[in-house]
């Protein structure tokens, strides 16, 4: 048997603060997932040459859990003559957890509460990503262009464990810096030229 649920949502807000083009924007999104499955594993294998039996009697529980969310904020400041300065920041986090725990019966009570470490395996992965950017945008009658710079810190962690025993725990931190260039030219209503570069 098993059960689970999956939920997600998104909230957006944007407000123009004056007639010149000052704009504040904000968004928040996220989701969560949680499910489980129960399984019975019973087998009795007889090895004739070795004259022995191998009995496997287990109740296995599978759990899969995850969540994620992202927050974003943007500020656009008009500089005059159809020129704008934009600052943005985003923060996102994601975590995934997959558990497989096998239990054998207690010899005294018969309840399946003894963890079988040979058949159990659990892992958890976590990710955090950020981006801060500052850009200049110019709008003209036939064309517009944007020149900016991004800073992208990120963090990841991967854990492998059985019960309370940690088998491996690896983490990594990285910071990337990248330029950004965008150029759009409108020849007519049907024809546009677009150039975009996001360096890494």
Mark where each language-model region is:
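Primarily recognizes Gram-negative and organellar outer-membrane beta-barrels
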Residues: 1-200
């Amino acid at each position: 048997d098993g059960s689970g649920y999956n939920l997600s949502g998104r909230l957006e807000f944007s407000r123009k603060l004056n007639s010149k083009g000052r704009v504040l924007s904000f968004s928040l999104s996220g989701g969560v997932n949680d499910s489980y499955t129960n399984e019975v594993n019973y087998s009795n294998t007889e090895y004739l040459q070795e004259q022995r039996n191998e009995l496997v009697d287990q109740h296995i529980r599978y759990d899969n859990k995850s969540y994620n969310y992202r927050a974003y904020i943007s500020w656009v400041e008009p500089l005059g003559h159809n020129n704008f300065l934009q600052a943005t920041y985003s923060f996102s986090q994601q975590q995934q957890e997959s558990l497989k725990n096998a239990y054998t019966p207690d010899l005294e009570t018969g309840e399946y509460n003894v963890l079988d470490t040979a058949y159990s395996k659990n892992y958890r992965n976590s990710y955090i990503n950020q981006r801060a950017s500052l850009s200049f945008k110019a709008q003209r009658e036939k064309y517009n262009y944007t020149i900016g710079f991004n800073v992208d810190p990120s963090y990841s962690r991967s854990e492998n464990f059985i019960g309370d025993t940690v088998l491996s725990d690896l983490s990594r931190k990285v910071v990337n810096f990248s330029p950004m260039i965008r150029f759009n030219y409108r020849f007519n209503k049907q024809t546009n030229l677009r150039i975009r570069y996001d360096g890494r």
